[in-house]
Swiss-Prot record:
GO terms for cellular component: mitochondrial outer membrane. May mediate the reduction of outer membrane cytochrome b5. Pfam families: FAD_binding_6, NAD_binding_1. The chain crosses the membrane at residues 32-48. One of its GO terms (biological process) is ergosterol biosynthetic process. Its EC number is 1.6.2.2. Residues 72-176 form the FAD-binding FR-type domain. One of its GO terms (molecular function) is cytochrome-b5 reductase activity, acting on NAD(P)H. The keyword Repeat does not apply. It catalyses: 2 Fe(III)-[cytochrome b5] + NADH = 2 Fe(II)-[cytochrome b5] + NAD(+) + H(+). InterPro entries: CBR-like (IPR001834), Cbr1-like_FAD-bd_dom (IPR008333), FAD-bd_FR_type (IPR017927), Flavoprot_Pyr_Nucl_cyt_Rdtase (IPR001709), FNR_nucleotide-bd (IPR039261), OxRdtase_FAD/NAD-bd (IPR001433), Riboflavin_synthase-like_b-brl (IPR017938). FAD binds at residues 179-214. This is NADH-cytochrome b5 reductase 2.
Length: 322
C-alpha cells in the first residue's frame, strides 16, 4: 500500500524574522557608565537569585504510576469515553482509579489487554496507547476492528462503564534524547501507534533534535489514523518532520502516493545506508514485514533483515521491528 512514485513534502511554514537595530553607539564616554553597569549587574544578580530561589522552591510532582511491571498483576480499567474515528476505527478512553496517576509507560513501550470470552481461552493482545505518557487520569487506545480479530471485535463492542484488564508496561525500543540523528518510520494501518508515540516524545523535548521521516500506508484516505496529530507535528516542525501518505485505493483528487511499496520509493525518501547514526522502524501487518524487512521470530528476536531494506543495503543494526 505504498506508492510507486516519489511523494511530495508538505510545504514548510513561512518563518518570521525579528529585525534588530544596527545603529552604532555614540562616540562620547560617560562617567556614569560604571555606575550603570554596577546597578545593572546588581539587578541581574537579584533577578537570578529570585529565579533560582523560586525554581528551588517549585515542587516536583512525582505522580503515582498505574503500571509498574514486574510482579504486578492485571489492572482493571473502566471505559469512560468512545469516539468514532472512521467506519472501522474507534478511540477508547480508559480512566484510572486515581485521577492524579499516570500510566507509567516509557517510550517506546506497550500494554497487554485481556478479556475472557464466554467460551474458550482468554484473549491477550498488545496495544500502544496514543495518549501522552505524562497524561494523568486516563489512557487512550486507537483500535481498528479486523474481521476475525477477537480482541478488536471485543473492544469495538464495549460500552461506556464496561471494564478491561491491562498489564505492563511491555518495553520495546528504549529512547534517549538524540539517540539517533535521523529516524525513519515505515508504518501500515494501526502500526502507526508506536511510531506516533516515538515521534511525539521527540518533538515535545526541546533538547531532542532528531530528524524524523514517516512513510505511512493505508487502504483508503479515511483509514489514515492520527492524521490530525501527524499534520500538527509536520506544521510545527517542518524542517525536521516529513510525512508521506500512501494509499492503495486513493480518491480521484489524491495527490499523494498510490499503490504498493517499491525499492524506488524507499530509495527516494529514506537516508542512504551509508549515512551515520540512522535508524529505521517498521510496524504494520505481516505482509508489510515480509516485504519491507522480514518478520520477527518472536517478541524478543528481531530475526534476520530481508526484504527491500536489505536489498537497498541497510544492515540489521539499522532496523528495528516493532
Amino acid at each position: 500500500m505504498f506508492a510507486r512514485q516519489p511523494l511530495r513534502f508538505a510545504q514548510p511554514l513561512k518563518q518570521g524574522f525579528r529585525k534588530y537595530s544596527t545603529e552604532a553607539p555614540a562616540k562620547g564616554k560617560s562617567s556614569l557608565a560604571p555606575i550603570y553597569i554596577s546597578v545593572g549587574l546588581a539587578g541581574l544578580g537579584v533577578g537570578l537569585y529570585r529565579y533560582s530561589t523560586a525554581s528551588a522552591e517549585t515542587p516536583v510532582v512525582d505522580r503515582p504510576k498505574v503500571f509498574t511491571g514486574g510482579e504486578q498483576g492485571w489492572v482493571d480499567l473502566k471505559l469512560s469515553e468512545i469516539e468514532n474515528l472512521s467506519h472501522n476505527t474507534k478511540r477508547l478512553r480508559f480512566e484510572f482509579a486515581d485521577k492524579e496517576a499516570v500510566s507509567g509507560l516509557q517510550v517506546a513501550s506497550a500494554l497487554l489487554t485481556k478479556f475472557k470470552p464466554a467460551e474458550g481461552k482468554p484473549v491477550i493482545r498488545p496495544y500502544t496507547p496514543v495518549s501522552d505518557e505524562d497524561q494523568p487520569g486516563y489512557l487512550d487506545l486507537v483500535v481498528k476492528v479486523y474481521p476475525n480479530g477477537p480482541m478488536s471485535e471485543h473492544l469495538h463492542s464495549m460500552n461506556v462503564d464496561q471494564r478491561l484488564e491491562f498489564k505492563g508496561p511491555i518495553p520495546k525500543y528504549p529512547w534517549e534524547t538524540n539517540k539517533h540523528k535521523h529516524i525513519c518510520l515505515i508504518a501500515g494501518g494501526t502500526g502507526i501507534t508506536p511510531m506516533y508515540q516515538l515521534a511525539r516524545q521527540i518533538f515535545k523535548n526541546p533538547e531532542d533534535q532528531t530528524k524524523v521521516t514517516l512513510v505511512f500506508g493505508n487502504v483508503s484516505e479515511e483509514d489514515i489514523l492520527l492524521k490530525k496529530e501527524l499534520q500538527e507535528l509536520e506544521n510545527t516542525h517542518p524542517r525536521r518532520f516529513k510525512a508521506f501518505y500512501v494509499l492503495d485505493n486513493p480518491p480521484k483528487e489524491w495527490t499523494g502516493g498510490k499503490g504498493y511499496v517499491t525499492k524506488e520509493l524507499l530509495k527516494t525518501v529514506l537516508p542512504e545506508p551509508k549515512e551515520e547514526d540512522i535508524k529505521i522502524f517498521v510496524c504494520g501487518p505481516p505482509g508489510m514485514y515480509k516485504a519491507i524487512s522480514g518478520p520477527k521470530v518472536s517478541p524478543k528476536d528481531q530475526g534476520e533483515l530481508t526484504g527491500l531494506l536489505a536489498e537497498l543495503g541497510y544492515n540489521k543494526d539499522q532496523v528495528y521491528k516493532f
